Amino acid sequence: MQVYFIDNEQYFKKKVTWFDAKDKLVPDNDERAIFFARGVLETVRKLSWAPDIIHCHGWMTSLVPLYAKQMFQGDAHFENTKIISSIYDEGFNGTLNGSLHEKVAYDGISPELVQDIKLPTFDALNKIAMEHSDAVVCGSEALPTETQEAFNALTQPTMRYMEPELSSAEMTTFYDSILEGKQEAVEG
């Protein structure tokens, strides 16, 4: 397995990650999420990869499914790629920059598709990731209520939370079923 790191001095060379020293959200988290989503997908194209699966973990990756399905729609590199999102309870209170939806729409994504992130909360980001994924994994024992309700309402394949030591074989089976186009859930 090859591992690549997506980096940008302006966004990621800070001494903080998501929160500043006063436990407030870093003001450019929205732009960092956009940069990361585009950076990952552009790197895949630049290296001429055609991944079978892109598995996104956590809220910072929440825009990857949207960008892959909309901005890169019709791109041969992603033609057969399945997007899986793992949703966790580790997030944030409050909102990201209120203009996130405008910045995403500026990238050519239909404004109708970004209505849910006009108020860019943790739950809204999880919801947009789930809506644009081919399958979703619950990565935490408990999710925030709004995220859990959105997860429960999904029509695409899902995998319920499993203890990490039990999930490896189940995840392989889940990947195989997604690649084969089966529409089934895996219960934990």
Model-found features: residue ranges?
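Catalytic cores of nucleotide-sugar-dependent glycosyltransferases that transfer UDP/GDP/TDP-activated
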Residues: 1-188
